[in-house]
Amino acid sequence: MASRLTLICLPHAGGSASFYRSWAALLPPEVELLGVRYPGREDRFEDPMIDSMGRLVTALADALVPLLDGPYALFGHSMGSAVAWELAHELDHRGAPGPRRLFASGRAAPGTAVTGELHRQGDDTLCAELQRLGGTSREVLDDPGLRSLILGMVRNDYRLIETYRPAHRPPLHCPIHVLTGITDPELGEERIRDRAAGWADLTTARTEVRTFPGDHFYLTPQRREVVATVLRRMDPSLTTGGRTWPSTP
């Protein structure tokens, strides 16, 4: 392989860079993991949260453009999939190199995903939604301090994704790989492939749909197989290994 690859990972609503921390141990030295940390969480807790897709993508592009000195791929989960798609277009608009591949996990294509108004609902409704999707333990939601902290981030991000209306854009030119859990309640088991396949209209290159056992957060128990799949698509010569990981400011 001629140069090192960077895997840029964008989290789900309420998530942050640490969601991908465990991936570092599965990556070979040829791949650098760059976890995106949205403002208002972890060591960016003092930074104001952003509840607009346009402003978030602008801020991410500002941080990432100086770092794009080689081939890279974008991986987004749930809300992060839409952020990754918008980010690819914003980077192209700035004349930056485009991603080698885009991995869209756990979300229908922009413009086809079902939106709602959960960000306007009470805390109990938001907690019920988090339990429905999985990925958040009952113990965390039962702790008043942790619950308040998490719901603040979740409500902000739900406002972002529920008010997001993608503009009509030309297709990307990189392959799009769609990954999803076979029982993901966000997509619906009976129509999961049809909804995931909507990404095919957003690129001139090929699109692949890959399903895994599990629900919306399938990629936690299926972490090893997900990472192996990503590596094979990035470069067939890559195998799992391990290294440390940085994250964006």
What are these regions (language model features)?
Residues 1-75, 82-249:
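Domain-scale detector for complete catalytic domains at protein termini or as standalone homologs
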